[in-house]
Amino acid sequence: MSEAAFQMDNGWLEFNSDPSVPDFKVPAGAIDAHCHVFGPGDVFPYAPTRKYTPCDASKDQLFALRDHLGFERSVIVQATCHGADNRALVDAIAHSDGKARGIATVSRAISDDELLELDSAGVRGVRFSFVKRLVDVLPHDTLTEVAERIQPLGWHLVIYVESQDLPDLSEFFASLPGTMVFDHMARPDVTQAINGKAFDQFMRLLADNENMWTKVSCPDRLTLAGPPRYDDVVPFAKRVVEIFPDRTMWGTDWPHPNMTSHMPDDGKLVDFIPRIAVSDELQRKLLVDNPMRLYWPEEFNNGP
């Protein structure tokens, strides 16, 4: 971390630099479909409008973790602390030897040429965050315009929203064009029943809109039971994987920004996977086929 460039927030939990080796061996070609890079701040400064200042988490550290956990590829999601400055993201993709794709954050002012540059760099989608403690949420007409402009590129939307806000936003989400992927199952309240009103609404949204996918990631953010097993999250993620096996993905969320209760062991997060995707077929769809279809379709469609 460059102290001269910035100072990470007091109380910030830094990522585990010595994660365990997972007991679960992921299938060949597995993809970590949700991870981030932060800075380094002295090279890629954090946005002046950021709501938090993290520790540095470099591309080299991310790629080392990928290899340690047994994954082959990564989908790097633009962190809100970098705003719409995607340089750290693009740099990481450029140094991945073709093993990474990206999800950018863009403003309404972005030009068509700039979108094409991001596409050439390996970006395949745009993230919209509706979590007010992390971002200033943009007006719906701005988001709709961006969503429409990325369709010719074949990009998709990534939606970060929390379950309590879903009732007010579901109609808007259903109006947006193209494929969209919800982060972390829209962050359900795992103290409620898996067939309760709140989670059922999310499941109905997926059932009614075949263009909607979700990541069954971040048990560490949702749990009250705690690590390493995250038993209270398992029923929710398992239900989603079983009902929507072709529209689910998984990711580490490394380096786990804004955690307050604990810092997860990434090896133990991988061991969560066979508890929610209980067969070889479900595991392959979750970790290989589904993210390949979305991020490397040119390889998936031409594969054996």
What are these regions (language model features)?
Residues H34, R66, L89, L118, ...:
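Conserved, mostly hydrophobic/aromatic
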Residues E3-D9, P139-W250, E299-G303:
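Catalytic pocket-lining loop regions of alpha/beta-barrel enzymes
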Residues S2-G29, K59-R73, R239, F244-R247, ...:
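Mid-to-C-terminal alpha-helical segments outside catalytic/metal-binding sites
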Residues I31-C35, S74-V77, A100-A104, V126-F128, ...:
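Hydrophobic faces of well-ordered beta-strands that scaffold small-molecule active sites
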Residues D56-L65, R108-L118, D141-L143, A198-F199:
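Short, acidic/polar
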Residues A47-G83, K99-T105, V123-V131, W155-L157:
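Divalent metal-dependent hydrolysis catalytic cores, especially in the metallo-beta-lactamase
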Residues H36, A79-T80, T105-A109, S129-R133, ...:
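Active-site beta-loop-alpha junctions enriched in small/polar residues
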Residues S111-Y160:
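Hydrophobic alpha-helical segments and helix pairs
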